[in-house]
Amino acid sequence: MDGSETSHSSGLNDFLLRSSVSSGSRSMDVIIYLINDEVIQLTVDGLSVITAHELHKSIREALQLPETAQDVFALWLISPLLEVQLKPKHQPYKVCRQWHDLLARFTNCSSNDILQDEPYLQFRRNIFLPKARELQISHERILYLLYEEAKYNVLEGRYPCDVEDCEVLGGLACRLELGPYNQNEHTPATIRPKLDTLFPPYLCKKRNGGLLTTFKNRGGRQASFEQTVLNTYKEVKETSACTDEQAMKNHYKEYLKKCHELPYYGCAFFQGDVDKPAQGFLNRSGRKAVSVSVNLEGVSVIDRKEKHVLISLTYPELSWDHTYPDEDEHILWLEFDGESEGTPVNKLLKIYSKQAELMSGLIEYCIELSQSTESPASDSTPGNSQLSEKRSKLKRQESVLCNRMKHLTTIDYVEDGAKITRVKPKRTASFFTRQNTHNYSAVQPSETPTES
């Protein structure tokens, strides 16, 4: 025990020396990163007690952002193992000192990985910023930072997109970064070196393997990535009456609007696993690594390997609970409507994750926040209707956004008369009008839904 404690202390000291947040009681340098790896270096007094709110103000001043940016962006502590948005009252230095404890509590990482992990401060979008409010922003620098973050998430596969959407986004990115289309300057040869900054590299790799055959021009022949992006670049609409600055703002908003169609836009990501359906002659099953995204609108479960949605639910469509049968196995339960062999059922999905507690708390807070700020008129706007039609169309086309229930193992229940027999975890909270007191009985499955 003594040896392990000494090792942990030594690792923590090394971590603090290497960290982007330097310790000390005098004026010290602090490094904050933007999503595009741009660095902001600040000199601050009282680093050990400075709050995220105070540091946020210094960053806004360094970037010459207006005070309205206070609600648009937040400070995050980021590492490959965990991402945490800091509250304004949090003290980043103290959270850094607790980082190893947070990793031990909320990840399954080995002791060695925990000791080697080093977080850094990042200035990025606040997950509690409503999309409608985002589109009201008129400051170009704020829109640029939001665009850079959205593009990063698309390129890295954190925001899985259909090929057709990537084409549109790539064309808009060309316009924003290369200026208005000029047929003499902008050719496939000029686009080719920039392709990995315009189009998700993982889709390019899939196409090389023959999986992407949807890149076709109007003549029906397969087009190159360069030509496809160039075609959408040509189609970006220009308004001659507006200034260059206003044109840039308009195109930033076009890019963001397109990303708003993704159910996980502006979310916080968590890591977990779900049960795979039993497959093969031996009826083998296992677990699938997933990312769970939580934002103001709902929860999405994304296949980390295939980069497509397994299930996406808005808050009116789900109930949830967090349980921990034992200390090392926390579970987030999602309950939603479905059907089994034509029979309407309630489905329970188990997500195994030591971050289930964080997910549950964030879901609850997002629902409370949405209910306190929602506008009845906004729910029935033409834009929302068009978005619903768009998503329905995508599902018919086997979009990456469509639910893939066949890839999930769920526990199914049906209503059973007037008597109440609780056969599922008791929910921590109930926010939905559809959640009257019900009686459920288990659907007898042909195979056991639990792990084998």
Curated annotation (Swiss-Prot):
GO terms for cellular component: cytoskeleton; cytosol; plasma membrane. Keywords: Cell membrane, Cytoplasm, Membrane. InterPro entries: Band_41_domain, FERM/acyl-CoA-bd_prot_sf, FERM_2, FERM_central, FERM_domain, KRIT1/FRMD8, PH-like_dom_sf. GO terms for biological process: negative regulation of canonical Wnt signaling pathway; positive regulation of tumor necrosis factor production. Residues 28-374 form the FERM domain. Gene3D superfamilies: 1.20.80.10, Phosphatidylinositol 3-kinase Catalytic Subunit, Chain A, domain 1 (3.10.20.90), Pleckstrin-homology domain (PH domain)/Phosphotyrosine-binding domain (PTB) (2.30.29.30). Pfam families: FERM_M, KRIT1_FRMD8_FERM_C. Residues 373-395 are annotated as: Disordered. Residues 373-387 have a biased composition (Polar residues). It is found in: Cytoplasm, Cytosol; Cell membrane. Promotes the cell surface stability of RHBDF1 and RHBDF2 and prevents their degradation via the endolysosomal pathway. By acting on RHBDF proteins, involved in ADAM17-mediated ligand shedding. May negatively regulate Wnt signaling. This is FERM domain-containing protein 8. It comes from Xenopus laevis.
